[in-house]
């Protein structure tokens, strides 16, 4: 994992998350992206020839390593930590960090622990019953600039996972207007 990617992932843990009604959106275009209720992967795929995943981490972390706000959203249990970079036509667009509780991994249509380089959203939103709640957004301030981020809890067949996404500078979220 290169240094900027490590910095991006670390910054996702430091975001001051806000509810949509409290967040100051830079523009309507970004608001539409951040409030997306469907699959971000599918949406990104519409803006490139090829959407690829660079898998950075995919392993179990203990409940005590979760931040308190993460534990509140998921319950206190060990989770599969999946960290990725989503790339559109080989250009990094989104850094993603997903926590999937062990109980969410069992009795599912799909083996989420074996996603590999398949975008998680494509699998999750193919399930029979998917909902999103606890949507939050925020800003990440880094030497490379100011980036939008969002976090939400996805329910796949009534079992939760927590997904955080950092939109990098070349992401389509910034296409209409630069932040």
UniProtKB/Swiss-Prot annotation:
Removes the pyruvyl group from chorismate, with concomitant aromatization of the ring, to provide 4-hydroxybenzoate (4HB) for the ubiquinone pathway. One of its GO terms (cellular component) is cytosol. SUPFAM superfamilies: Chorismate lyase-like. The keyword Chloroplast does not apply. One of its GO terms (molecular function) is chorismate lyase activity. Belongs to the UbiC family. It comes from Vibrio parahaemolyticus serotype O3:K6 (strain RIMD 2210633). Pathway: Cofactor biosynthesis; ubiquinone biosynthesis. It catalyses: chorismate = 4-hydroxybenzoate + pyruvate. The keyword Nucleus does not apply. Its EC number is 4.1.3.40. This is Probable chorismate pyruvate-lyase. GO terms for biological process: pyruvate biosynthetic process; ubiquinone biosynthetic process. It is an enzyme of class 4 (lyase). HAMAP family: UbiC. Keywords: Cytoplasm, Lyase, Pyruvate, Ubiquinone biosynthesis. InterPro entries: Chorismate--pyruvate_lyase (IPR007440), Chorismate_lyase_/UTRA_dom_sf (IPR028978). It is found in: Cytoplasm. Pfam families: Chor_lyase. Substrate binds at residues 82, 120, 165.
């Amino acid at each position: 994992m290169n240094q900027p990617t490590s910095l991006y992932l670390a910054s996702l843990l430091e975001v001051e998350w806000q509810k949509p009604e409290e967040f100051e959106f830079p523009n309507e275009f970004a608001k539409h992206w951040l409030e997306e209720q469907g699959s971000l992967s599918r949406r990104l795929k519409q803006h490139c020839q090829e959407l690829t995943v660079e898998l950075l981490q995919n392993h179990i972390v203990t409940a005590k390593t979760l931040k308190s706000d993460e534990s509140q959203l998921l319950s206190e249990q060990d989770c599969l930590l999946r960290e990725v970079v989503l790339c559109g036509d080989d250009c990094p667009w989104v850094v993603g960090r997903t926590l999937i509780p062990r109980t969410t991994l069992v009795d599912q249509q799909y083996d989420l622990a074996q996603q590999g380089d398949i975008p998680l959203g494509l699998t999750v939103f193919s399930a029979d019953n998917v909902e999103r709640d606890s949507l939050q957004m925020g800003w990440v301030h880094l030497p490379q600039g100011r980036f939008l981020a969002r976090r939400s809890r996805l329910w796949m067949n009534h079992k939760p996972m927590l997904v955080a996404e950092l939109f990098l500078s070349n992401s389509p979220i910034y296409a209409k207007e630069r932040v």
